[in-house]
From Swiss-Prot:
This is S-locus-specific glycoprotein BS29-2. It comes from Brassica oleracea var. alboglabra (Chinese kale). Residues 350-430 form the PAN domain. It holds the Pfam family B_lectin. Transmembrane segments: none annotated. InterPro entries: Bulb-type_lectin_dom, Bulb-type_lectin_dom_sf, Pan_app, S_locus_glycoprot_dom, SLSG/EP1.
Amino acid sequence: MKGVGKPYENSHTSFLLVFFVLTLFSPAFSINTLSSIESLKISNSRTLVSPGNVLELGFFRTPSSSRWYLGMWYKKLSERTYVWVANRDNPLSCSIGTLKISNMNLVLLDHSNKSLWSTNHTRGNERSPVVAELLANGNFVLRDSNKNDRSGFLWQSFDYPTDTLLPEMKLGYDLRTGLNRFLTSWRSSDDPSSGDFSYKLQTRRLPEFYLFKDDFLVHRSGPWNGVGFSGMPEDQKLSYMVYNFTQNSEEVAYTFLMTNNSIYSRLTISSSGYFERLTWTPSSGMWNVFWSSPEDFQCDVYKICGAYSYCDVNTSPVCNCIQRFDPSNVQEWGLRAWSGGCRRRTRLSCSGDGFTRMKKMKLPETTMAIVDRSIGLKECEKRCLSDCNCTAFANADIRNGGTGCVIWTGQLEDIRTYFANGQDLYVRLAPADLV
């Protein structure tokens, strides 16, 4: 028939036209990015994978639960290990969920299009498109699509950790924004909702980390002494890891870096209340616990021995009065009720006082201490002697022979001794007790 082409010719032409249009106008697909016209859905099982194929972001559910979460895990390990969960306390109730970009924010929608989680940021240029990207270090960021560096970040998952600290993540305060980055345990090994334990930085005087069970302080790390935290001597330098603690006008934060990126290591607060360093062992296909804190529930329990006493796992009982101090209540002390602590045999005279040196110690709690990083140990001793309220002193930094000064003017609490590491603490004594 004139003017009518063969059916297969029209079909072939239409197919080529559709293919050309889709190729020309469809967004460029990248395995680690999500554009404003793309989405992640439980139904399509799409995930984002970091460059290097180390970490993967997508939807998951735990074996015993029907609830769904948006989270991140190690991609290539035989043991599924989650390192971040977006909606840990607001899970999807069924297998219908969508992550997309809306109004310059990442939004997680449930089966009724109700928002269960959002980045909820308010800054940015509305005329500039945004993109979500999973970076090589595991940081999931929402950024200006025209800026690939940190200046373009509108939001980042590194600012909102769950129970895990990855290399390059920071634990502590951003003083410019007031943001406090801390870890909170899972409710159980099979439930990612917020659990009982949290690990937070306190920044008064000499910063250190506190482990809380709900609102109760159960352990403290001891202050950073330039090498590590004085109450965590197990966390020593490894050839493939660099530790850093920053304290300046912009931030007070701890981080660690890997010098060998083929090794996977992380810090985690477990559902049972342990802060742990874990490193993956390929030969065994398991996470190896390098150290765990609290190390023991004798000497690592907060203030177990009371004021002016110290804990030593190698003595019986474990609580001991500082040299030239005696139990405040001898009867209770004999019953191993140590919370009353110890008291001086001789009151300080403020003239002719001296010091006893305690080696390999976890420094006392520092929230009321006085810190001066500009002077050394000798000047620190003089300053302590010139203050009748001074009860002890120590170096703030133990590197290069010791620098800086920490002075205590109140009771000395939560002290313990170690077989190795720790640092020197100088406790003030009256002249009669120096013999």
